[in-house]
């Protein structure tokens, strides 16, 4: 269930203590002329240790925007603490034709979630707010490229209203690759995965089209993340990747090859951080040595001689 208020989308996840899934999807909602969805993911499969929040561009909106589109968005994720304070994280990110889903992720590593520790789970509920500060269409930079925020209603039962259905048409085009519906821009990428790893989804059982597409998009996002250099990937990104990879494996994907790559990136990241720490230490040591050298080379005072 979710509710819209101008440029904000509020999502309440209920019955958290009894959830048996580590990945949840909000309803679709329309803001700035684009359809979006939020994904909540728990590393520990219980939504009590940590929480990753991901914003995705809906597949139908990606199709509607056509070839070569890109969209800049400035977002604030807020995890509402119902007892004391609010935990939020601001994100500025670019969505485009190649990375329209799972493109922007933020992880809240805040320890225990339940009301006895942090106040994020109260009466079995977590409250999440996504606020859009700015959306800019980078394909055509004009007065119309930044459409005004549009409020879209949900029915009392939490289902999408007819207004939203009219605003977001059905998926116009997708191509099936090994049983997965993907965007035309993703076809070659997905084909390459199945050519190199034919058993990657052999034990993946879900048959729902939306669920299958969401999992495939997670896989593509993980691969894109790990293609970056360790310097470009943050520690939070890698923590989130570890959690998502675990979920993918639990869902039936065979990803030993991707896990190996992730471990390599983690090792490189640790080495990079270690080298950077050592470089800072060396710089401090050099400053001390220079100061000592200047002190040694300084002329003696009269009192030092007489």
UniProtKB/Swiss-Prot annotation:
Q: Tell me the Pfam families matching this sequence.
A: MATH_2 (PF22486), PEARLI-4 (PF05278)
- Indicate the secretion signal residues: none
InterPro entries per the record?
MATH-CC_domain_protein, MATH/TRAF_dom, PLipase-like, TRAF-like
Domain MATH stretches: 6-132
What SUPFAM superfamilies does its record include? TRAF domain-like (SSF49599)
Q: Does the keyword Coiled coil apply?
A: yes
Q: Which UniProt keywords apply?
A: Coiled coil
Q: Which residues form a coiled coil?
A: 253-298
What Gene3D superfamilies does the annotation carry? Apoptosis, Tumor Necrosis Factor Receptor Associated Protein 2, Chain A (2.60.210.10)
Asked if the keyword Calcium belongs to this entry, the reply reads no
Q: What protein name is recorded for this chain? A: MATH domain and coiled-coil domain-containing protein At3g29580
Its source organism is Arabidopsis thaliana (Mouse-ear cress)
């Amino acid at each position: 269930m979710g509710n819209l208020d101008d440029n904000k989308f509020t999502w309440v996840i209920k019955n958290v203590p009894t959830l048996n899934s580590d990945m949840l999807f909000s309803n679709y909602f329309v803001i700035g002329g684009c359809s979006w969805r939020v994904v909540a993911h728990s590393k520990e499969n219980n939504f009590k240790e940590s929480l990753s929040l991901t914003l995705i561009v809906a597949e139908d909106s990606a199709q509607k925007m056509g070839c070569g589109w890109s969209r800049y968005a400035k977002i604030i994720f807020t995890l509402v603490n119902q007892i004391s304070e609010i935990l939020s994280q601001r994100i500025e990110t670019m969505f485009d034709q190649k990375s329209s889903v799972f493109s922007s992720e933020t992880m809240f590593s805040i320890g225990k979630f339940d009301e006895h520790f942090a106040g994020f789970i109260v009466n079995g509920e977590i409250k999440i707010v996504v606020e859009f500060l700015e959306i800019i269409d980078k394909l055509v930079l004009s007065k119309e490229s930044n459409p005004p925020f549009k409020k879209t209603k949900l029915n009392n039962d939490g289902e999408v209203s007819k207004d939203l259905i009219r605003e977001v048409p059905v998926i116009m085009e997708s191509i099936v690759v090994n049983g997965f519906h993907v965007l035309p821009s993703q076809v070659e990428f997905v084909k390459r995965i199945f050519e190199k790893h034919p058993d990657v989804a052999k034990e993946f059982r879900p048959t729902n089209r939306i669920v299958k597409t969401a999992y495939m998009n997670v896989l593509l996002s993980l691969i894109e993340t790990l293609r970056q250099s360790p310097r470009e990937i943050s520690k939070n990104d890698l923590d989130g990747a570890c959690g998502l990879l675990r979920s993918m494996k639990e869902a039936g994907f065979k990803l030993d090859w991707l896990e190996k790559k992730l471990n390599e990136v983690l090792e490189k990241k640790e080495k990079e951080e270690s080298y950077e720490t050592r470089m800072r230490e060396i710089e401090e040591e050099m400053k001390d040595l220079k100061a000592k050298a200047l002190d040694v080379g300084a002329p003696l005072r009269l009192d030092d001689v007489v």
